[in-house]
Each structure stands twice: as structure tokens, then as C-alpha cells.
Amino acid sequence: MNNTEFSKIAETTIAYIADKIEEQDKEASIDVDLQGDILNLDTDKGIYVINKQSAAKEIWLSSPVSGPYHFFYEQGKWKNKIGLELMAILTEELNIKFDNI
């Protein structure tokens, strides 16, 4: 995947995460702040940071619950080196249903 393709997929994914949270968080318990390529989620568990790392062609997640992760894009999913999926981690920790996009 070239840099342009990576940027488009990563930016679409991060925007999708922000949109899904705002759509499903009926109590507005998660403060969503998307600034460029950086998504901050302020929750009662702490602050999540999701951002794109262009040089590595990865999305990075910093979770106050489970720690840091680096995800690469493979077969339509963002996975880390041991096979954990970005959307699965977010679904479990935030109680928001994400589909793979």
C-alpha cells in the first residue's frame, strides 16, 4: 500500500471511530475530540488517544485500560502483531459496537 492509500484508509478509520462513538454514546459519557489525525476520547476510565503514524503505516492506540498498541492494515482490518484487532479492543473497552470498514 502506498502512502496515499494508507492515509485515506487511516483517516477514514479514525473518522469512523469518532462518528460511531458520537452516534452510539446516548448518555454523552465519552468526550470525542478529533483534531486532524488525532482522536482523543475522554472517558470515565481515562483518555484514549488514537492516531495515524504515516512513517510506519500504522494506527496507534493508547488505552488507559490495556496500554499502547500499534496496528497495521491487513485484509480490511487493523491488527497488531499478535492478531488483536483495533475495533475489537475498542468495542470491549468502550462498549460501542464497531464494524470493520
Swiss-Prot record:
Pfam families, sorted: Frataxin_Cyay
Keywords, alphabetical: Iron, Metal-binding
GO MF term set: 2 iron, 2 sulfur cluster binding; ferric iron binding; ferrous iron binding; ferroxidase activity; iron chaperone activity
A single BP term in Gene Ontology: iron-sulfur cluster assembly
InterPro entries referenced in this protein's UniProt entry, alphabetically: CyaY, Frataxin/CyaY, Frataxin/CyaY_sf, Frataxin_CS
Gene3D superfamilies (alphabetical): Frataxin/CyaY
GO cellular component term of the entry, any: cytoplasm
SUPFAM superfamilies reported for this sequence: Frataxin/Nqo15-like (SSF55387)
Function: Involved in iron-sulfur (Fe-S) cluster assembly. May act as a regulator of Fe-S biogenesis.
Family: Belongs to the frataxin family.
Record's protein name: Iron-sulfur cluster assembly protein CyaY
The organism of origin for this protein: Rickettsia felis (strain ATCC VR-1525 / URRWXCal2)
